[in-house]
């Protein structure tokens, strides 16, 4: 369902080196990425719909006719939609109008705690059994079985790999248990405290602390800043089960519940199952009160500075108004679209500034957003270098005032309309093959704002009615009206103190507002210059791989094309271009500049820059990404069927005529200057930075760039490493999706097939394919972070082997990893309650000779690290010496097999698996073998794999602790 336009067209590309990314850097983890837009209104309480009523009953917006909406006599609503593609899959969501805003002072954090208790015992399902029951039906914990708590809702999620009666009935039974039958026993609550506290530790990042402070600054005295979903540590540590049970009975009630089921089933039969399972549900005790969210108070221009050493420099200028509580109506949606187009134009201007030769900031966006029905805000957001905030603030303020004073131009508006129309048309074309989880999440996402669930075709129709005859003056007026309200309020987070603090920020803002702004200049005319690459190439050879519905093609210039037509997603076509040998072509002893890959795309093409490319191709759906893979330099993109020729033109132009503009490289380099400071702020950031280099024994192709590497990097070095391979190495094109073989051949023949012949593929020297694994250590390698004193990570890895050494052994190792994951969860999360997210990962390389691993990791307080290493060693020993049970084997294998089967009906799976298959037919054999090979793994195979690889004297251990812990101890 279309709700808003993209904010900041190239922002992700500009800021790819920021950590943890722009949204988190400005402290917006809880704001929607595509904010809902509306008009301000007088303060009022958010009115819930009467029990059992859907929004369309009070709206003129047509509801999706393919969704069966209903309600039970007890007030519980349900929405059912048949989605037959992919076959045999379904998604179930149970949403409660119950979040942290409903908590009392003594219950802060208990809405989320209750979500955890849903997996810890009910009247008919013993503690610890719910997840195991689902695993036996192929649902993996975390991936297919999950839940989330927000300010105003709690949602339970099941993604079903099968829709047989047993799986569906079991899933509905467990949802019913969650709704009304939880036991919330004392022992279970006490065990779960450590898990919830672990989640609190893990979530307390620099970006989250920025978010908390900013929310409190924007909404002082209101309930939302006082009811963050994670809650208060003292409540989590001490709250009795009775307080959790009180919240449960007050807010988990039929009239506050909505069940959404989407998938491959008969809707009438599903409706009967829902009625049979939920009709007798009755609420217990009195209903809980609706929270008083508070009022937006009158305020003048104010500023607040937060010094957060591990955060990026971010600044927001915000106007705050009472929330928009108007009903969802066609007129409102049309006005929202007009307003969103206005913001899209402004954000496009910010993008152009960020791409300029002397960019005043790293990135900036503007939007309006609802804040939990507590307020509506208009925000100007920017990220800049710490010493450049004044220049950045001036640029954002002046560009906003320029847009408000002089308005938007018709050509700017028409461009945004064309882009939204193209993406909306693609959404309509692909509607029949959306995934059940996507549709279910969209329906759930509409409930909090009481919006009508609409079909993509209706969204497009509303959009077209809104933009028909739309003039720039109307959009300009909407933009001007959006910048109103209390304030503006200026919030800055900085990694270091700012001289003069808040008074200096206010003075700078006042100063820039005195600067007169001139009208914007109209852009120059431009045309797409890469429609022809010469005489189309001729097909030299064609080979059909009939059992995989795949065709191999070789052109006379040596370019290879692999095509797999599918109907997994209507109107979706994925393209990947593999050139040369990637990391294998780079030196082992010098820092690779592959991490500057975004600068390659942002650098544009010789005949047209990236900004103009986006403008001239606004009506097309295309993509361009660049990466240095282990076995190829990779260009990739996604498109719709009609735009495949354009997609191929774009990718061919990047290979044959890249622009290598220095501005893009410098922006990337500038963003990287504070990257180490940001990553050192959490244990997760440190391990993210260090792990790849450590697991490859210091091979510079895999190490993260040092501060010095970033500072001294030169565009010429990147160009020297990459350009010769792009210009001369063999090319393989893989196309998967809603396309015919003939159309794929035609598009490639006119682009890559028309290029001059490339040199023949050469074997990679054995020394370049050899990567070492780190030597075992008796004591963990200790790394430090600068975050909270109670945050630490433990990590253990054992070397295994590459895939081709023994493909069946690799699958045995995968199942071994799944069994170890089950045992880590049982021991560290369920039995000890010391961590939220123990995990096991494994890899068997298709590229590096002899390289593979199986690893276990955990986030715990530092004092628990030794216990983790002991527990992992014991689990490894048990796996070496004792047989796994039949139940464990089933719970390990079935979710993995079901995951593989689900993956095989996606275009992404085949794009990855078919890459390189023409040069290495073993990849085809492994595609055929992976599911039957996993099915045949036995308990004896798992034990043998553990004996081969889980040896104490081979284990490589790593720990990330808070800086200064040993000195403090």
Explain the meaning of each model-derived region.
Residues 15-24:
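C-terminal segment of classical bacterial N-terminal signal peptides
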Residues 181, 186, 193-194, 244-275, ...:
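Non-catalytic, conformational "gating/processing" segments within enzyme and secreted inhibitor domains
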Residues 236-240, 244, 710-713, 718, ...:
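Alpha-helical scaffold elements lining the catalytic groove of polysaccharide deacetylases
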């Amino acid at each position: 369902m279309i709700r808003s336009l993209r904010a900041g067209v190239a922002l992700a590309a500009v800021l790819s080196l920021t950590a943890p990314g722009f949204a988190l850097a400005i402290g917006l983890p809880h704001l929607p990425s595509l904010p809902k837009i509306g008009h301000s209104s007088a303060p009022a309480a958010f009115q819930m719909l009467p029990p059992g009523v859907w929004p369309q009953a009070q709206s003129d917006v047509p509801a999706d006719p393919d969704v069966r909406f209903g309600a039970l006599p007890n007030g519980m609503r349900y929405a059912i939609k048949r989605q037959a593609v992919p076959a045999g899959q379904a998604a179930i969501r149970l949403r409660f109008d119950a979040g942290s805003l409903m908590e009392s002072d003594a219950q802060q954090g208990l809405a989320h705690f209750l979500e955890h208790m849903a997996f810890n015992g009910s009247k008919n399902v013993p503690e610890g059994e719910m997840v195991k029951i689902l695993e036996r039906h192929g649902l993996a914990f975390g991936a297919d079985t999950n839940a989330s708590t927000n300010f105003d809702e709690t949602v339970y999620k099941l993604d079903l790999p099968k829709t047989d009666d047993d799986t569906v009935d079991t899933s509905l039974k467990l949802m019913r248990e969650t709704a009304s039958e939880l036991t919330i026993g004392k022992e279970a609550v006490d065990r779960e405290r450590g898990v919830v506290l672990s989640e609190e530790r893990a979530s307390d990042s620099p970006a989250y602390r920025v978010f908390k402070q900013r929310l409190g600054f924007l909404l002082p005295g209101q309930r939302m800043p006082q009811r963050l979903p994670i809650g208060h540590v003292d409540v989590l540590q001490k709250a009795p089960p009775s307080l959790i049970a009180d919240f449960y009975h007050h807010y988990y009630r039929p009239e506050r519940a909505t069940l959404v089921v989407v998938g491959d089933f008969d809707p009438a039969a599903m409706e009967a199952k829902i009625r049979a399972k939920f009709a007798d549900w009755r609420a217990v005790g009195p209903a809980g009160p609706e929270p008083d969210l508070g009022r937006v108070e009158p305020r003048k221009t104010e500023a607040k500075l937060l010094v957060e050493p591990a955060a990026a420099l971010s600044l927001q200028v915000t106007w705050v108004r009472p929330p928009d509580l108007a009903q969802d109506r066609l007129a409102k949606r049309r006005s929202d679209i007009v307003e969103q187009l206005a913001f899209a134009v402004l954000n496009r201007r910010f993008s152009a500034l960020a791409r300029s030769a002397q960019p005043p900031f790293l990135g900036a966006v503007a939007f309006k957003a609802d804040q939990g029905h507590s307020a509506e805000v208009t925000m100007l957001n920017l990220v800049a270098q710490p010493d450049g905030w004044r220049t950045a603030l001036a640029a954002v303020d002046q560009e906003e005032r320029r847009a408000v004073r002089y308005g938007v131009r018709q050509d700017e508006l028409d461009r945004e309309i064309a882009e939204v129309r193209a993406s909306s048309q693609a959404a309509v074309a692909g509607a029949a093959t959306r995934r059940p989880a996507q549709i279910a999440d969209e329906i759930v996402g509409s409930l909090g704002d009481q919006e009508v669930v609409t079909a993509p075709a209706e969204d497009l129709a509303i959009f077209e009615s809104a933009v028909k005859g739309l003039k720039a003056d109307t959009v300009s007026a909407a933009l001007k009206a959006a910048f109103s309200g209390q304030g503006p309020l200026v919030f800055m987070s900085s990694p270091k103190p700012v001289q003069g603090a808040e008074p200096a920020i206010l003075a700078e803002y006042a100063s820039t507002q005195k600067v007169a702004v001139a009208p914007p200049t109209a852009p120059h005319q431009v045309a797409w210059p890469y429609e022809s690459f010469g005489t189309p190439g001729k097909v030299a050879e064609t080979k059909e791989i009939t059992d995989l519905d795949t065709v191999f093609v070789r052109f006379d210039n040596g370019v290879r094309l692999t095509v797999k037509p599918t109907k997994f997603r209507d109107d979706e076509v994925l393209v990947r271009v593999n050139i040369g040998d990637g990391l294998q072509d780079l030196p082992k002893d010098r820092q690779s500049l592959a991490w500057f890959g975004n600068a390659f795309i942002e650098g544009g093409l010789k005949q047209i820059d990236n900004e103009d490319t986006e403008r001239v191709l606004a009506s097309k759906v295309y993509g361009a990404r660049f990466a240095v893979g282990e076995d190829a330099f990779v260009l990739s993109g996604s498109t719709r069927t009609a735009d495949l020729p354009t997609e191929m033109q774009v990718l061919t132009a990047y290979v044959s005529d890249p622009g290598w503009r220095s501005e893009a490289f410098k922006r990337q380099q500038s963003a990287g200057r504070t990257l180490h400071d940001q990553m050192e702020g959490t244990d997760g950031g440190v391990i993210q930075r260090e792990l790849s280099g450590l697991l490859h024994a210091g091979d510079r192709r895999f190490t993260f760039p040092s501060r010095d590497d970033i500072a001294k990097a030169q565009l010429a070095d990147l160009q020297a490493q990459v350009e010769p391979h792009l210009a001369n190495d063999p090319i393989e094109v893989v196309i998967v999706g809603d396309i015919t073989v003939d159309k794929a051949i035609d598009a490639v023949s006119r682009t890559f097939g028309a290029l001059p012949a490339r040199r023949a593929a050469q074997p990679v020297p054995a020394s370049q394919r050899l990567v070492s694994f780190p030597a075992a250590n008796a004591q963990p390698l200790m790394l430090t972070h600068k975050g909270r004193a109670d945050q630490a990570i433990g990590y253990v890895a054992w070397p295994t082997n590459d895939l081709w050494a023994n493909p069946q052994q690799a699958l045995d190792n995968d199942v071994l990893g799944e069994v170890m994951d089950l045992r880590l969860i049982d021991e560290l999360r369920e039995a000890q309650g010391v961590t939220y997210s123990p995990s096991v990962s494994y890899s068997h390389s298709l590229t590096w000779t002899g390289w593979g691993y199986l690893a276990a990791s955990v986030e715990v307080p530092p004092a628990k690290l030794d216990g983790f290493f002991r527990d992992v060693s014991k689990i490894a020993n048990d796996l070496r010496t004792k047989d796994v049970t039949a139940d464990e084997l089933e719970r390990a294998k079935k979710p993995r097999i079901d995951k593989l089967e689900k993956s095989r009906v996606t275009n992404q799976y085949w794009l990855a698996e078919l890459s390189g298959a023409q040069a290495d037919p073993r990849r085809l054999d492994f595609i055929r073998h992976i599911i039957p090979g996993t099915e045949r793994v036995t308990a004896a195979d798992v034990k043998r794999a553990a004996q081969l690889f889980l040896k104490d004297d081979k284990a490589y251990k790593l720990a990330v602790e808070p800086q200064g812990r040993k000195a403090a101890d």
